[in-house]
C-alpha cells in the first residue's frame, strides 16, 4: 500500500517511469510464459475465475478456441499440476499420442501411454489399442474417471499389483447433485435425461458429450473398502467443473468421530425459505447474497413501498452478467418474498434506563407464558409424593350447629343419646317424639342438663371435629398427576410464540445463512470387483480380427478426448412403428355418424363395419346438391370428405329486411311507425349514431323506475349541471317505455342509444374513450363536450374520463385527419369497407431485398433503362439503395380495401381521391393496362397525370397519400420500399385480393421469393372482405357462391376456335407473344389481374394450365362481365386426376370448394353487403355495491388498472412517515417514479435548519428621467429585415436541404417577409437535417470503441489549469478539504429535489427508459435542442449548427449530480468578490454587482468557438483534481473519469468533450474558462465576470509570461475583443449597472409581433427592458449610440401595447406585489429572467398552472442552495 501511494505521488513527475522499471522487469517473464502456455482468446468475464483458481493466464491470447477456458484448465492440469506429481516413471491412460509427446517433453517421467479403443470414435483418437494394463506405480487417467465406477477402479488396482497412485481428472459439475441447471452458465451448461448428464462446454454443442449421472459420486467418496483391497480417494484440486482426484492403495482405515467434509466454489448466494406448505426446488430459491441484502434494506428504507418496487429493484440487477446463473423463478421468488415480508419487523425492545422493579415487570410480561408452561409439568409430581408420605387429608367438619335455638347441623333431638345405653335409644327417641321434654318442670330439665343427659338450648352453638379423607387409588393419582403436563402442552399449543422464538424465527427466515455447496464424504463398500475393461486384452490373430465384427459393450466405456470427453456410442434402438392410417371404412363410418348426429338420429356407430347402416335422409339430400364427392385442392391432393359448399341462393334478390320485430310494435306508450331516431329528432349526429329504431312517444313522461345499473347517467351527470334522476326524466320524456325498461337495461345497463337521446336533449358532444380508440357520439360541433371512459369489463362500465398523465400502450391512438376523413366518406350511401387504419411497421430488410434485386436487374426494368449519367434510372436506384442502407423503421397508417374480384374496390377510392382532402395522392399499379383504366376513370388534367404511376416510377415521386392497386401483384417488400423512399407519406390505401394471384419474379436469380409472402404479411390489415361482385355474371358467381349485382346471366362454354376481336387470356408470356404476332389480342392471366372486360374473354387451355394456381385461375374466371370461352386442350379441365380443378368446375358447372382451393379463405372477415352505418353501440352497467371476494391480502394493490395516473397510490403497501417531527413533509413525492428509477433515489430527509434571509436596502440615488427621441416601432421594423432569398442561407447536402429559415405559410405583418427569418430557427420536428448536418461541428469522435487514453499533454495541461484555478481563488493547490458527509447528504436531497421538480410527473413517467437497467450508463443519446436563438451573433446570420443535448442515464444524473452541487457550495466561500459568476443570479443582481465593481471604460471581452468540443483530456484531469480537493470519495472520481473516457452515442464513440446535459456542465465550463483567464493574464484584483464560455475583464491586466507555451497546448479558439461597452450574457454592463441589449430585444419583439403572440410575451420582455430602464437617463451610457433607436422603438412599443398595470414596472418606485400577481394571472408564458425575480408564491402559482417551461437552472433549487450556503459555513467545514 505504501509503494502504491508513493507511485501515485509521483504520477505527475518523470520519476514514475524509473520507479516502475523493476515492476515491469518482473512482469515480463510471467507474461511471456502465460502467452506461450495459454495462447487462446479468453473472454474478460472468465479471467477473474481463472486467476482465482490460480491459473496464470494473461488474457492477451490471440488464438481462437471453441471452449478456451476448458482448454486452459486442461493445459494447466497437464503441464503444471500433473507435471510436478510425476516424480518417478509413470503411465498415462486415455490421451492422444501428440498430446502425450508434449507432456513427456516437459517431464520425461511420463514414460508409457496406454489407450483402449472402446468406442467407434476412439479409432480417430488412438491409432492403436494397448494390449496390456499400465505397468508403473503411478498412473494418470485423463478425463475418463466419470465412465468408471469404484468396483472397476478396484479391479484395476487388483490387476496391476505395482500400481500405487492413480491420478484422475474428473469433469463433472458439483451442483448436479441437486439441480439440473448450471451455476456457471457462461462456463458450461448441462441437461439431465434419466441417468445421463449431457455436458456442453462454453456453449460449444459440437464438443458436448454424455456421461453417467452418478459420476458425481466420485466427489462424495473418501475411501473404497473391499475384502481384497482398501483404496483412499482424495480431491486434490478443483477448477470449476474439473477436479483432480488421487486414488491410492492400501492406506489403513483410521476411524474418526467426525466425517470429512468437502466443499466447492459457487457464486455467493443464499437460499430463500420455502413458501408455507409448498415445495419449491432449492435451485429456484438461490439468490445472490448482495442483492438480497440490498433489497432487504431497500424495502425498509424507502418512504413508500409500492407493489412494483421490489420487482423494479430486482430488475436493476437481473440483467447483470455476474448474475446470469440466477433463474427467472428465483428472481420472481425474491421479489415476491421481499414484497410479502416487507411489513415484518423484529419484536424487540431496547430499554436501558429502567429500574430493577420495572425490569422485573418487563421480564415477567415477556416470559410469563413460558415460565408457566415450563413449571406446570413439575406440579404433577406433588400427588404421588403426598400419597406416599401421608395416609390421607385431615378435613375439619361441623358436627353441631345451632342458631336462634334451631339446630341446623347435627342431631335435632333434646336428649343426648350418647349418654344412654344403645338399647335405650329407641325408647328415648319415642319419649322425645311424644313431646316429653317441653313438659318437664324447669328444675328437672336443668338438672338433666347438668348431668349431660339433656341438651342446652342456646341462640348460637357450633361444634367441629376432624375427619381423615384417604387418597384415591394409584390410577386416579396418576391421572391427576398427568393433568398439569397436559395443560402445559395445551397452553404451549395455543399460546403465542415467545419473544425469543419470534426473534429467532425472524433471523432464520429473513436473514438466512449463506448457501455452501458441501457434503460429508462416505466410504464405498465393494463386495466383488467388476472388470475394468469389458474385453479381453489378448491380441487376436489378423484373420480373426478381420472376420469378427467389433464387439458391442454392455457397460458405457470411458471416452477420452482431446479437449473434452466425447459421448459413448448410442445403443441402437429399433424404430417405433409408425401409426397406421385409419381404415377407409372407419372414415366413412365416422362421417355417417356425424351426419346422423347433425340430423338428431341414432348413431350407427354400434353397427359392424362389414354391414354399414343405410344412408340417412340427410345424406341423401346432401348428395343431391351439385357438389364434388371428391374435390381437388391446389396441390392436386384428393379430399375424400366433401367440405361445405356455398349456397346457390346467394344471388336471389330480396328486398331490404324491415326493422327486427321487438316490443316497439306492441308498446302502447308510443305512436306511429318504427323509424330511426334521427328521423324524429333530426340533428347532425356522429357516425350514424342516431339510426337506432324507435317510435314517437305519445304519452306523457314515463313512470319507469330508475335503473339499478345507471353508470352511464352517473358519468354524464358528473360533467353536466344535472343530476342522475333529472337525466333519467329526460329519457322518460323522449323514449318509449320498451326502450326504458327491458331485459337489456335490467341485466346489462344503459346503452349509447340513451346517450344519443340525451345529447339531443341537452345538445352536447360526447367522446367515449375505449381501450382501443376514441369514438365520438352526440351532436357534431356542439358547444358542450364531455368525456366518458368505457371499460370493456367484465363487468362493462361507463365512468367519467379523467385525463391521465400516463396510459397503457395503445389506449390513446391518434388518428390522422386523413384517416378520419376516409372513415366519414360515403359513396352511394355506403362507407368504405374498412373499420380502422392500422399501423404498419416498415421492414427495412424487406425493402433492402427488393431494391437490391432491382439494382441488379432481377426485378423490374428500371435498371435497364438508359438516360443521362447523373440522372439515369440506374443512378436513381443506386441513390435509393444507399438511402435504404441508413434508414430506420417507422410506422405509417395503412387502410386495406379487400374483396372478391369485381366487388368495386377501385371505384369508391377514385371518388375519394377527388375530394379536397385527398387531392395530394399518388397511384401505384402493377401494369400499364391497369394504369390506363385508372387514367380513364379519374380523367385528370394533363398537369396531374403524373400521379398515376406504375410501381417502379412511383418510387421516385412524392405525395402524402399513396394508393396501391393490386398490392399483391407487386414484389414483396414494395410497400416498405416506397415508404422509405418517400418519408412524406402519411397514409397508404391498399387495394387487393389475397385470393388472387401474387407477384412472381421472372428472373431465376431473384431472391425476392425468399421473403415472406405478402398475403401473409398484409392480410392482417383486412377489416372486411367484400363478398359480392358487380362484374361477374350469375353463371360465374354461382361457381363461388358469391352474390352478384350483374343482371346478366352469362355463360361458360367450350369452343373450337378463337372468337374474333375478343381478349385472350393465356398462361405464359411466350404464348401471349405468339398470339399477338398472329393478330390476336392476348395477354397473360396474371397481367390481366385488375382488368375488367365488357366482352367475353377467351381462356386458352394447354399443358401450362395444369401448373397455374387456384389464385391465377380465379383471376381468369372473373375478368368478364359477359361470359367465358374455353379453347384448347379440354383434357386439362376434364376433372380427372392431375387436371385443373378450377377450370373443371367451371366447365361442369359444379361449385368451387373455396376452403380447399384457398387455405386463406377461412381467415377472411366476410361482409355480405356494403357498410351503411358506422354506429358503435356500447352497453354497460356496473353496480359498485357488488362484492368481489379478494383473492389475496392486497387485491386492490396488486391489480392495477389499465390507465395508471401519476398519483396512483393504491399499490402502496408500506408508508414510512416522519416519526419525530410535526413539520410538513418537504420531500417531493416519488410515487410516480418508475420502479427501476426509485432504487437510484436516496429519498433522504433534509436536516438543514431553516434560515432567516435578510434583504439590504439600496442607497442609490434617484435616477433622472429619460428623454428619448420619438421612434416608431412599426416604421423601424418595416425596414429592419433586408429583402433576401431565405433559400440561399440554407445548407444542402446531397438531395437534402435544411429548414432553418422557413418562410412558406409563415405569418408576417411588419415587413415584406416573416420576422422569424432574422435568425436561424432550430426545430428538429420540422427539420430532419438539423441534427445530421450539425454532428460534424458539435461532436468529436474517437477512433475506436477503446477508452480515451490521456496523453502527457493532457496531464501537464490539466495540472496547470488546476494550479491557475486555485490561484484565482487564492488557494493552495496541494491543500484538501475534509469530506463533509452531512453537507453531501443535503446535496443529495437537493439534487433529487431538482430532478423531481424540473419536469412534470407525466414527463418522468414517459421517460422511464432513462432508468432502464439494459441501458449502459456510458451510452448517451444525442438529440437536437429546439430553440430560436436571437442575439448579436445570430441576427442576419446564415445557417447555424444546432445545440446538441445529451440524454444520460438516471444513474449518472443521480450519482454525480450531488457531487457537482457539493463542489458549487464549497467553492462559493473561497470565490473572491471581484469574480462574478452568473449562475443562480438575476439581472438585478448583475446590475448591482456591476455598479459596485466595474470602473473605467477599458474592458476585455472574450467568447470561444466550439467551446465544449475544445475541452479534451485536460478538462477531465482538471475536473478530477477539483473533486479530489474537496474530498470527494475516490469511487465517484473514478466513475466520472470512466464516463468521460468511455462515452458513446448512437452515432459512435465520443472523445473527451463537454456534453450539454452532463452533471455540472455550467460549473465545469465556468471553472475551465476562469482557469484559462488566469493562465493568460496576471490578475491581481481586476473585476472579472465569467459565465460558461462568456467572460469580461475590467481593465487590461498584463499577459502571463508562460502564456505562449500554454496556448500551444490548448485547443481553444478565442474571440477576444477590447471595448468600452462590454456585452455579457445578453446585457450591456458598466459602472452604472446593466441593460438588456436593445438590438436583440427589438428583434425578439419583431418575431413575437409577427407570430401573433405579442401579448403573451410582452410582460417578460417588458421586465427585461425595465432592468436598464430603471437606471434612468444614465442607461444611455451602457450601449452604443447606434442602438438608441432600437431602445426608443422598444420604449414606443411598450408604451402603446402594455396595460397600465404592466407599466408600473417602468416607474422608479418600488414594484408593488400586486404587479406580479396580475402578471402571473394574465401571462401564458414567462421567460427565465422574469421567473428568477418572481416571489415564491407567484412561482408556485405559475408552476401549478403549467405556464413554466423546464429551465436548466431552477430558481427554487438555487434558493435551496443559498440556504445550504448559510447553514454550512466554510470555516467550520475546514476545521472538522
UniProtKB/Swiss-Prot annotation:
Residue span of region Disordered: 546-583, 595-615
All copies of domain RdRp catalytic, residue ranges: 1497-1603
Family: Belongs to the Tymoviridae non-structural replication polyprotein family.
Pfam families: Peptidase_C21, RdRP_2, Viral_helicase1, Vmethyltransf
Residues where ATP binds: 899-906
Protein name per UniProt: Non-structural replication polyprotein
UniProt PTM: Specific enzymatic cleavages by the host yield mature proteins.
Domain Alphavirus-like MT per the UniProt entry, residue ranges: 58-219
Domain annotation Peptidase C21: ranges: 658-812
GO biological process, one term: DNA-templated transcription
Occurrences of domain (+)RNA virus helicase C-terminal (ranges): 1027-1159
Organism of this sequence: Ononis yellow mosaic virus
Composition skew (Pro residues), residue ranges: 546-582
Site keyed Cleavage: positions: 806-807, 1180-1181
EC number from the UniProt entry: 2.1.1.-, 3.4.22.-, 3.6.4.-, 2.7.7.48
Amino acid at each position: 500500500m505504501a509503494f502504491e501511494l508513493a507511485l501515485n505521488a509521483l504520477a505527475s513527475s518523470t520519476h514514475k517511469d524509473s520507479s516502475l522499471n523493476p515492476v515491469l522487469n518482473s512482469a515480463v517473464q510471467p507474461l511471456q510464459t502465460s502467452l506461450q502456455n495459454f495462447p487462446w482468446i479468453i473472454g474478460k468475464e472468465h479471467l477473474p475465475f481463472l486467476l482465482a483458481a490460480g491459473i496464470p493466464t494473461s488474457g492477451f491470447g490471440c488464438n481462437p478456441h471453441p471452449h478456451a477456458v476448458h482448454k486452459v484448465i486442461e493445459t494447466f492440469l497437464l503441464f503444471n499440476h500433473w507435471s510436478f506429481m510425476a516424480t518417478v516413471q509413470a503411465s498415462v491412460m486415455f490421451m492422444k499420442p501428440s498430446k502425450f509427446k508434449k507432456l513427456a517433453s516437459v517431464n520425461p517421467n511420463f514414460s508409457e501411454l496406454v489407450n483402449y479403443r472402446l468406442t467407434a470414435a476412439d479409432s480417430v483418437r488412438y491409432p492403436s489399442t494397448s494390449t496390456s494394463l499400465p505397468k508403473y506405480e503411478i498412473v494418470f487417467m485423463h478425463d475418463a474417471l466419470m465412465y468408471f465406477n469404484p468396483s472397476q477402479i478396484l479391479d484395476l488396482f487388483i490387476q496391476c499389483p505395482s500400481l500405487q497412485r492413480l491420478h484422475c481428472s474428473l469433469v463433472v459439475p458439483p451442483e448436479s447433485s441437486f439441480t439440473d441447471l448450471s451455476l456457471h452458465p457462461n462456463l458450461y451448461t448441462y441437461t439431465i435425461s434419466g441417468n445421463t448428464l449431457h455436458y456442453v462446454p462454453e456453449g460449444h454443442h459440437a464438443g458436448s458429450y454424455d456421461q453417467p449421472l452418478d459420476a458425481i459420486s466420485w466427489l462424495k467418496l473418501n475411501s473404497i473398502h473391499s475384502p481384497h483391497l482398501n483404496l483412499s480417494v482424495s480431491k486434490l484440486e478443483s477448477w470449476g467443473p474439473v477436479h483432480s482426484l488421487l486414488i491410492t492403495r492400501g492406506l489403513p482405515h483410521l476411524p474418526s468421530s467426525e466425517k470429512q467434509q468437502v466443499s466447492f466454489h459457487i457464486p455467493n448466494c443464499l437460499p430463500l425459505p420455502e413458501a408455507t406448505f409448498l415445495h419449491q426446488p432449492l435451485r429456484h430459491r438461490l439468490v445472490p447474497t448482495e442483492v438480497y441484502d440490498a433489497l432487504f434494506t431497500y424495502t425498509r428504507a424507502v418512504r413508500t413501498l409500492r407493489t412494483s418496487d421490489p420487482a423494479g429493484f430486482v430488475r436493476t440487477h437481473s440483467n447483470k452478467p455476474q448474475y446470469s446463473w440466477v433463474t427467472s423463478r428465483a428472481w420472481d421468488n425474491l421479489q415476491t418474498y421481499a414484497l410479502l415480508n416487507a411489513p415484518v419487523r423484529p419484536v424487540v425492545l431496547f430499554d436501558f434506563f429502567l429500574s430493577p422493579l420495572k425490569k422485573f415487570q418487563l421480564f415477567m410480561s415477556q416470559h410469563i407464558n413460558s415460565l408457566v408452561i415450563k413449571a406446570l409439568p413439575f406440579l404433577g409430581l406433588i400427588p404421588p409424593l403426598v400419597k406416599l408420605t401421608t395416609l390421607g387429608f385431615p378435613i375439619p367438619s361441623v358436627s353441631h350447629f345451632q342458631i336462634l335455638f334451631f339446630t341446623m347441623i347435627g342431631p335435632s333431638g333434646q336428649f343426648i343419646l350418647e349418654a344412654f345405653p344403645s338399647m335405650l335409644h329407641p325408647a328415648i327417641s319415642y319419649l322425645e317424639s311424644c313431646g316429653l321434654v317441653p313438659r318437664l318442670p324447669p328444675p328437672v330439665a336443668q338438672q338433666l342438663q347438668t348431668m349431660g343427659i339433656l341438651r342446652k338450648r342456646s341462640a348460637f352453638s357450633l361444634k367441629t371435629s376432624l375427619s381423615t379423607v384417604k387418597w384415591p387409588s394409584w390410577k386416579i393419582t396418576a391421572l391427576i398427576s398427568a393433568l398439569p403436563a397436559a395443560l402445559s402442552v395445551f397452553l404451549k399449543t395455543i399460546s403465542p410464540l415467545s419473544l425469543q422464538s419470534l426473534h429467532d424465527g425472524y433471523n432464520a427466515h429473513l436473514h438466512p445463512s449463506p448457501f455452501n455447496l458441501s457434503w460429508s464424504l462416505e466410504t464405498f463398500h465393494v463386495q466383488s470387483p467388476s472388470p475394468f475393461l469389458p474385453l479381453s486384452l489378448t491380441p487376436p490373430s489378423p484373420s480373426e480380427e478381420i472376420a469378427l465384427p467389433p464387439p458391442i459393450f454392455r457397460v458405457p466405456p470411458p471416452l477420452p478426448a482431446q479437449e473434452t470427453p466425447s459421448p459413448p456410442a448410442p445403443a441402437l434402438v429399433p424404430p417405433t412403428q409408425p401409426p397406421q392410417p385409419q381404415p377407409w371404412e372407419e372414415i366413412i363410418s365416422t362421417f355417417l355418424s356425424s351426419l346422423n348426429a347433425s340430423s338428431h338420429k341414432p348413431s350407427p356407430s354400434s353397427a359392424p363395419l362389414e354391414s354399414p347402416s343405410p344412408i340417412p335422409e340427410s345424406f341423401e339430400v346432401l348428395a343431391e346438391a351439385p357438389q364434388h364427392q371428391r374435390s381437388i385442392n391446389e396441390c392436386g391432393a384428393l379430399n375424400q370428405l366433401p367440405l361445405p359448399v356455398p349456397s346457390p341462393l346467394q344471388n336471389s334478390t330480396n328486398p331490404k329486411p324491415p326493422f327486427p320485430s321487438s316490443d316497439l310494435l306492441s308498446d302502447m306508450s308510443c305512436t306511429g311507425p318504427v323509424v330511426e331516431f334521427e328521423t324524429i329528432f333530426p340533428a347532425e349526429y356522429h357516425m350514424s349514431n342516431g339510426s337506432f329504431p324507435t317510435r314517437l312517444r305519445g304519452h306523457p313522461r314515463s313512470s319507469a323506475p330508475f335503473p339499478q345499473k345507471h353508470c352511464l347517467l352517473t358519468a354524464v351527470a358528473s360533467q353536466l349541471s344535472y343530476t342522475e334522476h333529472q337525466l333519467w326524466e329526460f329519457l322518460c320524456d323522449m323514449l318509449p317505455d320498451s326502450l326504458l325498461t327491458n331485459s337489456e337495461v335490467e341485466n346489462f345497463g344503459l346503452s349509447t342509444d340513451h346517450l344519443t337521446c340525451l345529447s339531443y336533449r341537452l345538445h352536447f358532444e360526447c367522446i367515449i374513450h375505449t381501450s382501443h380508440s376514441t369514438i365520438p357520439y352526440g351532436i357534431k360541433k356542439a358547444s358542450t363536450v364531455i368525456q366518458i371512459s368505457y371499460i370493456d369489463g367484465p363487468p362493462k362500465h361507463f365512468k367519467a374520463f379523467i385525463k391521465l398523465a400516463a396510459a397503457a400502450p395503445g389506449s390513446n391512438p391518434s388518428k390522422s385527419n386523413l384517416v378520419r376523413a376516409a372513415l366519414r366518406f360515403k359513396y352511394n350511401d355506403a362507407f368504405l369497407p374498412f373499420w380502422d387504419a392500422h399501423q404498419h411497421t416498415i421492414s427495412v430488410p424487406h425493402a433492402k431485398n427488393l431494391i437490391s434485386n432491382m439494382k441488379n436487374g432481377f426485378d423490374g426494368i428500371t435498371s435497364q433503362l438508359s438516360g443521362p449519367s447523373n440522372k439515369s434510372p440506374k443512378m436513381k436506384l443506386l441513390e435509393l439503395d444507399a438511402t435504404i442502407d441508413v434508414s430506420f423503421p417507422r410506422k405509417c397508417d395503412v387502410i386495406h380495401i379487400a374483396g372478391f374480384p369485381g366487388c368495386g374496390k377501385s371505384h369508391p377510392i377514385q371518388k375519394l381521391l377527388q375530394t379536397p382532402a385527398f387531392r395530394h395522392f399518388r397511384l401505384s399499379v402493377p401494369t400499364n393496362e391497369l394504369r390506363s383504366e385508372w387514367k380513364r376513370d379519374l380523367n385528370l388534367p394533363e398537369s396531374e397525370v403524373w400521379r398515376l404511376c406504375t410501381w417502379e416510377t412511383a418510387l421516385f415521386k412524392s405525395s402524402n397519400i399513396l394508393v396501391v392497386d393490386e398490392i399483391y401483384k407487386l414484389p414483396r417488400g414494395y410497400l416498405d420500399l416506397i415508404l422509405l423512399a418517400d418519408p412524406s407519406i402519411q397514409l397508404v390505401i391498399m387495394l387487393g385480393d389475397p385470393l388472387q394471384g401474387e407477384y412472381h419474379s421472372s428472373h431465376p436469380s431473384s431472391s425476392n421469393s425468399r421473403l415472406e409472402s405478402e398475403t401473409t404479411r398484409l392480410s392482417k390489415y383486412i377489416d372486411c372482405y367484400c363478398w359480392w361482385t358487380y362484374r361477374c355474371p350469375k353463371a360465374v358467381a354461382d361457381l363461388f357462391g358469391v352474390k352478384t349485382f350483374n343482371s346478366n346471366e352469362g355463360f361458360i362454354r367450350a369452343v373450337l376456335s378463337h372468337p374474333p376481336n375478343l381478349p385472350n387470356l393465356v398462361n405464359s408470356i411466350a404464348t401471349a407473344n405468339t398470339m399477338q404476332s398472329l393478330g390476336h389480342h392476348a395477354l397473360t392471366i396474371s397481367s390481366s389481374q385488375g382488368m375488367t372486360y365488357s366482352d367475353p374473354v377467351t381462356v386458352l387451355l394447354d399443358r401450362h394450365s395444369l401448373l397455374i394456381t387456384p389464385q391465377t385461375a380465379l383471376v381468369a374466371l372473373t375478368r368478364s362481365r359477359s361470359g367465358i370461352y374455353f379453347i384448347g386442350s379440354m383434357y386439362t379441365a376434364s376433372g380427372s386426376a392431375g387436371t385443373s380443378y378450377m377450370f373443371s368446375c367451371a366447365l361442369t358447372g359444379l361449385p368451387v370448394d373455396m376452403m380447399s382451393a384457398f387455405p386463406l379463405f377461412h381467415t377472411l372477415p366476410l361482409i355480405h353487403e356494403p357498410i351503411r352505418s358506422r354506429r358503435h353501440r356500447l352497453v354497460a352497467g356496473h353496480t359498485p355495491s357488488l362484492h368481489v371476494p379478494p383473492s389475496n391480502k392486497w387485491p386492490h394493490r396488486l391489480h392495477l388498472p389499465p390507465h395508471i395516473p401519476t398519483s396512483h397510490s393504491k399499490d402502496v403497501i408500506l408508508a414510512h412517515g416522519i416519526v419525530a417531527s410535526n413539520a410538513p413533509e418537504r420531500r417531493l413525492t416519488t410515487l410516480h417514479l418508475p420502479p427501476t428509477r426509485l432504487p437510484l433515489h436516496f429519498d433522504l430527509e433534509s436536516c438543514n435548519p431553516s434560515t432567516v434571509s435578510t434583504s439590504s436596502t439600496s442607497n442609490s440615488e434617484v435616477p433622472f428621467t429619460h428623454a428619448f427621441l420619438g421612434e416608431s416601432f412599426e416604421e423601424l421594423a418595416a425596414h429592419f429585415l433586408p429583402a433576401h432569398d431565405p433559400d440561399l442561407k440554407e445548407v444542402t447536402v446531397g438531395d437534402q436541404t435544411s429548414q432553418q429559415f422557413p418562410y412558406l405559410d409563415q405569418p408576417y405583418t411588419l415587413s415584406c417577409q416573416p420576422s422569424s427569418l432574422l435568425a436561424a430557427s432550430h426545430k428538429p420536428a420540422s427539420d430532419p437535417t438539423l441534427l445530421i448536418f450539425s454532428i460534424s461541428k458539435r461532436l468529436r469522435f474517437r477512433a475506436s470503441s477503446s477508452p480515451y487514453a490521456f496523453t502527457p499533454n493532457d496531464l501537464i495541461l490539466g495540472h496547470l489549469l488546476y494550479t491557475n484555478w486555485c490561484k484565482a481563488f487564492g488557494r493552495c493547490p496541494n491543500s484538501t478539504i475534509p469530506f463533509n458527509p452531512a453537507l453531501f447528504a443535503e446535496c443529495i436531497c437537493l439534487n433529487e429535489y431538482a430532478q423531481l421538480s424540473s419536469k412534470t410527473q407525466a414527463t418522468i413517467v414517459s421517460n422511464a427508459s432513462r432508468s432502464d437497467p439494459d441501458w449502459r450508463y456510458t451510452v448517451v443519446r444525442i438529440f437536437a435542442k429546439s430553440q430560436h436563438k436571437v442575439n448579436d451573433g445570430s441576427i442576419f446570420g446564415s445557417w447555424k449548427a444546432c445545440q446538441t443535448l445529451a440524454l444520460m442515464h438516471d444513474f449518472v444524473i443521480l450519482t454525480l449530480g450531488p457531487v457537482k452541487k457539493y463542489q458549487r457550495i464549497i467553492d462559493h466561500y473561497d470565490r473572491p468578490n471581484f469574480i462574478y459568476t452568473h449562475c443562480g443570479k438575476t439581472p438585478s443582481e448583475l446590475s448591482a454587482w456591476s455598479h459596485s465593481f466595474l470602473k473605467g471604460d477599458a474592458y476585455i471581452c472574450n467568447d470561444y468557438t466550439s467551446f465544449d468540443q475544445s475541452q479534451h483530456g485536460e478538462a477531465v484531469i482538471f475536473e478530477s483534481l477539483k473533486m479530489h480537493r474537496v474530498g470527494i470519495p475516490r469511487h465517484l472520481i473514478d466513475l466520472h473519469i470512466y464516463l468521460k473516457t468511455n462515452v458513446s452515442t448512437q452515432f459512435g464513440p465520443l472523445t473527451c468533450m463537454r456534453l450539454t446535459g452532463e452533471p455540472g456542465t455550467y460549473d465545469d465550463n465556468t471553472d475551465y474558462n476562469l482557469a484559462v483567464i488566469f493562465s493568460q493574464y496576471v490578475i491581481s484584483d481586476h473585476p472579472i465576470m465569467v459565465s460558461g464560455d462568456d467572460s469580461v475583464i475590467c481593465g487590461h491586466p498584463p499577459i502571463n509570461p508562460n502564456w505562449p507555451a500554454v496556448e500551444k497546448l490548448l485547443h481553444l479558439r478565442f474571440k477576444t475583443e477590447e471595448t468600452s461597452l462590454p456585452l455579457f450574457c445578453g446585457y450591456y454592463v458598466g459602472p452604472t449597472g446593466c441593460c438588456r441589449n436593445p438590438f436583440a430585444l427589438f428583434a425578439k419583439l419583431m418575431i413575437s409581433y409577427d407570430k401573433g403572440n405579442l401579448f403573451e410575451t410582452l410582460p417578460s420582455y417588458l421586465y427585461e427592458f425595465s432592468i436598464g430602464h430603471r437606471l434612468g437617463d444614465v442607461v444611455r451610457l451602457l450601449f452604443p449610440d447606434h442602438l438608441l433607436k432600437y431602445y426608443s422603438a422598444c420604449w414606443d412599443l411598450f408604451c402603446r401595447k402594455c396595460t397600465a398595470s404592466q407599466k408600473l414596472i417602468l416607474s422608479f418606485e418600488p414594484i408593488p406585489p400586486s404587479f406580479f400577481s396580475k402578471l402571473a394571472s394574465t401571462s401564458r408564458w414567462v421567460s427565465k429572467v422574469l421567473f428568477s425575480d418572481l416571489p415564491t408564491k407567484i412561482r408556485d402559482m405559475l408552476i401549478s398552472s403549467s405556464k413554466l417551461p423546464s429551465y436548466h437552472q431552477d430558481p427554487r433549487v438555487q434558493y435551496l442552495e443559498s440556504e445550504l450556503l448559510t447553514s454550512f459555513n466554510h470555516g467550520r467545514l475546514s476545521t472538522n
